[in-house]
Amino acid sequence: MISSTMAARVVDPYAEALVSLASAQGLLDTFEADIRFIAAVVQATPELGQFLASPLVKAEAKKNLLQQVFADQIHPLLLNALKLLSDRRRIMFLGAVCQRFLELQRKLKNIVLAEVTTAVPLTEAQQQSIRERVRDFTQASGVELQTSQDPTLLGGVIIKIGSQVIDLSLRGQLRRLALQLA
């Protein structure tokens, strides 16, 4: 198991280098879209992540697989960066590098990530309303929603923005009421 501080020491320089490279080349939006694609592919195919993380697989085999999977899908500079991660035996941190890149990208654009949990899926109008309220609350220029469902909430919404949690769920209200009555 790798500690989070060690992972951060490994992940941050690569993510920052990707942001710097993309910015210097005027490719921030391209890299962002490509990194979202890479993260989705790795998440959708656990075998790919296991293959890339395996210390038994040679770097050359990993680079060949990266070439086959991503060559026609992502920018060549980003593909070369993935190959560099493989050469440096850091490809097992690919998911974390992608996440950190997206965090840095949001920070550059003054966009906040709001993790929204509801009992049932939100309509587009509800999502837009939450975006507007979060934008007003945070003074950010944009809001990226990450939605999930939890039927145990019974109703309402829980919004997490960074380390702040806004619990407007029925479950949360019932819990607070029970604490007041106790």
Swiss-Prot record:
It comes from the Bacteria. It is a peripheral membrane protein. SUPFAM superfamilies: N-terminal domain of the delta subunit of the F1F0-ATP synthase (SSF47928). Keywords: ATP synthesis, CF(1), Hydrogen ion transport, Ion transport, Membrane, Thylakoid, Transport. GO terms for molecular function: proton-transporting ATP synthase activity, rotational mechanism. Belongs to the ATPase delta chain family. F(1)F(0) ATP synthase produces ATP from ADP in the presence of a proton or sodium gradient. F-type ATPases consist of two structural domains, F(1) containing the extramembraneous catalytic core and F(0) containing the membrane proton channel, linked together by a central stalk and a peripheral stalk. During catalysis, ATP synthesis in the catalytic domain of F(1) is coupled via a rotary mechanism of the central stalk subunits to proton translocation. HAMAP family: ATP_synth_delta_bact (MF_01416). This is ATP synthase subunit delta. It comes from Synechococcus sp. (strain JA-3-3Ab) (Cyanobacteria bacterium Yellowstone A-Prime). The lineage of its organism: Bacteria, Bacillati, Cyanobacteriota, Cyanophyceae, Synechococcales. The gene is atpH.
